[in-house]
Amino acid sequence: MAKLVTENISKRFKNQDVLKHINITLENNEVYGLLGINGAGKTTLMKIICGILQQDSGEIKLDNRPMTRNDLHKVGSLIETPATYNHLSAQDNLKIVCLNESVDFSEINSVLSLVNLNVDKKKKIKDFSLGMKQRLGIAMALIKKPEILVLDEPSNGLDPYGIQELRELLKLLTEQGTSIIISSHILSEIQVLADHIGIIHEGELKYQQRNNKDENLEEIFFKITKGDYK
């Protein structure tokens, strides 16, 4: 059963069509991998799903009904870089999220453990590595236990161990009932993580298939981005 469906989502900035009639389907408890070169429209689509941007036309459905502003608490997201207060600690940043989302502070330690971010409670975000900031951003997205998790390039700044931990975390989350949309520039990583894969190019969804790990995704991607894919 589909958890979330976008129906003919379109968006223009000034005179440029950034998204053109995008139709994607995120199934329950699965990972949807979104691929595309810089400027293809991936982040714009994710921002629309999260309610950060409004589409010009089209509709989003959640659990087979039109999605409204009241449903946005069901969506957790990490879009681009985490929005943090760099003079505060990870715990204090999460307390602010908890206050905004009406979440009990008791969830903080468990979500930090979940993303394997065990740091000195006095350590400020300004002293975090890029990978640590990414882990915190994922924790901030997860603290309200969303039904849908939207992650834009979550492996940025992670070392190989961190990427492996991310894989294990996403697997655990889907087993617990979370549906996930993830974007990446790393084709091989999407092919490992995703149940379905979509490729956006020049604002259009050029490819959408169930993940076939035997398929040459790199060849398909380069044919699409060069305009040779049929």
Task: Outline where the language-model segments fall.
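Conserved structural motif at the start of ABC-family nucleotide-binding domains
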Residues: L4-T6, L19-H21
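Helix-to-loop junction immediately C-terminal to a conserved catalytic motif
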Residues: C50
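Conserved ABC transporter NBD signature motif
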Residues: G58-H73, Y207-Q209
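Conserved ABC ATPase "signature" region
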Residues: K95, L99, F105-D120
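Hydrophobic anchor residue at the start of the ABC signature
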Residues: I138
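Catalytic Walker B motif of ABC-type/P-loop ATPase nucleotide-binding domains
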Residues: L149-E153
